[in-house]
Amino acid sequence: MALWGGRFTQAADQRFKQFNDSLRFDYRLAEQDIVGSVAWSKALVTVGVLTAEEQAQLEEALNVLLEDVRARPQQILESDAEDIHSWVEGKLIDKVGQLGKKLHTGRSRNDQVATDLKLWCKDTVSELLTANRQLQSALVETAQNNQDAVMPGYTHLQRAQPVTFAHWCLAYVEMLARDESRLQDALKRLDVSPLGCGALAGTAYEIDREQLAGWLGFASATRNSLDSVSDRDHVLELLSAAAIGMVHLSRFAEDLIFFNTGEAGFVELSDRVTSGSSLMPQKKNPDALELIRGKCGRVQGALTGMMMTLKGLPLAYNKDMQEDKEGLFDALDTWLDCLHMAALVLDGIQVKRPRCQEAAQQGYANATELADYLVAKGVPFREAHHIVGEAVVEAIRQGKALEDLPLSELQKFSQVIGEDVYPILSLQSCLDKRAAKGGVSPQQVAQAIAFAQARLG
C-alpha cells in the first residue's frame, strides 16, 4: 500500500507507478534507512510519542530487518513497494503490527531520504578515501623502485626533457592527494543531519535535533529546514570530485597506454590486466586502461546531468530530486572501481629501462641544457635559444645527437662553446641540474618519495 493513499479515490495507473517508483535503485539505501529509523524511534521517546518499551520493540525489529537485508539484499527487489522507505515501513509493520505505523510520526520522506543519502555518501566517501590512498601508495612504491629509470618527458606529445619514471609516478600522487583533499572537504560539508526537518517547515515535535544528529554519527544538525530537504550540494560536490578524479585516472591510463605501445615500448603490462584479439593472435590489448579512460565520460555526464536537474528547481522538495541517485551511485561506483583497477595495473607493471633510456637520448631532449650552458657563458637566453635551435637543425641534418657533434661544429654556432659542454649534455647532468623543489633531480625525487611515504603512513 502507498504511504499517501488516503487523499486519492482512484488507484495509480500501472504505467505511472512504474515510472514513479524508485525502489529499483534506492534499495541501496536500505541499511541507512533502517539506521535512521532506529535513531528516529529514540527521538520519538523523548517527546512522548513512543514509550521506552515500544521503542525497544521497534529497534529490535529494525535490527533484525537490518541483518536480514545484509544477508539477502536481493529480497528488496522482489517487492512492488514504491521506494525503500515504503519497503522498510511495510516490513516493520509485518513484524510488529500497528506499532510500526507510529514510527513515521513527525517525519517526512523528504528529510528521511535526505538523511539516508547523506549517510550513504559518508560511507562511500570512506571507501573512496581508502582506495585513493591505496593507489597513492602503489604509485609511491613504483616510484621507489624506478628512481633511476630515465625516460623522455613530453610536451605536445613531443619529447621535451628527460625525466624519470619515478617522477612521472609522483606527478599522479600529487593529483590523487588533491582528490583526497577534495573528498575530505566535501565530507565536512555533508556531515550535517537533515533529520527532523519534516517535509519543509520542520517537525511539530520538540525533538533535540543535535542529539539526533549525534546518534547518527553526524557532526551537527542543519540550521534551516527549507534548505535541508532541498539541499543536494553534497551530491554535486561528490560528483565534481569524481569527475576531476576520473580525469586524473583517464590521463594516467592514457599515459600508460602510450608507454605500452610498440612505438614507445617503455612498459609491459601484466597479463592479468590485458586481453587478446579474437582474430589477431599476437595482440595484447591494454583493456583495463582503456576502460578506465572510457568510463571517465559517464562520470562527467552524471555531473552535468545533476547540474541541469537542480538548476531550475524552486524550494523545497520536488520529485525531480529522485534523479539524484542513479547518476551518483553509478559515478561513485565507477570511480571506486577505477581506483582499484589502476592499482592492479601497477601491480605487475614492468618498466623497460634500456628502451626508456634510449628514447630519452633521442629527440634532442638535452637542447635546453645547451641553452642554459650558453646563458652561463654570458649569452642572453633569447639569443641562446636561437643558437641552439640552429644547432639542432644541423644535428638533424647530419643524423646525429647534439653531444655527437664535434666541437668545431658546435663552435660554428657560438665561439663560447668549449670542451666543457659535453658533460653538460649527458642525461645524468640534465637530471642533476633540476634540483629546485619539485624537480626531477635524484635528490628531489628521493625527498618527494619520503614525503609521500610519511604522509600516507
From Swiss-Prot:
Transmembrane segments: none annotated. InterPro entries: Arg_succ_lyase_C, Argininosuccinate_lyase, Fumarase/histidase_N, Fumarate_lyase_CS, Fumarate_lyase_fam, Fumarate_lyase_N, L-Aspartase-like. It catalyses: 2-(N(omega)-L-arginino)succinate = fumarate + L-arginine. One of its GO terms (cellular component) is cytosol. Pathway: Amino-acid biosynthesis; L-arginine biosynthesis; L-arginine from L-ornithine and carbamoyl phosphate: step 3/3. CDD domains: Argininosuccinate_lyase. PROSITE patterns: FUMARATE_LYASES (PS00163). GO terms for molecular function: argininosuccinate lyase activity. Keywords: Amino-acid biosynthesis, Arginine biosynthesis, Cytoplasm, Lyase. It is an enzyme of class 4 (lyase). Its main location: cytoplasm. Its EC number is 4.3.2.1. GO terms for biological process: arginine biosynthetic process via ornithine; L-arginine biosynthetic process. It is found in: Cytoplasm. Gene3D superfamilies: Fumarase/aspartase (C-terminal domain) (1.10.40.30), Fumarase/aspartase (Central domain) (1.20.200.10), Fumarase/aspartase (N-terminal domain) (1.10.275.10). The keyword rRNA processing does not apply. NCBIfam families: argH, PRK12308.1. HAMAP family: Arg_succ_lyase (MF_00006). Belongs to the lyase 1 family. Argininosuccinate lyase subfamily. This is Argininosuccinate lyase. It comes from Escherichia coli O1:K1 / APEC.
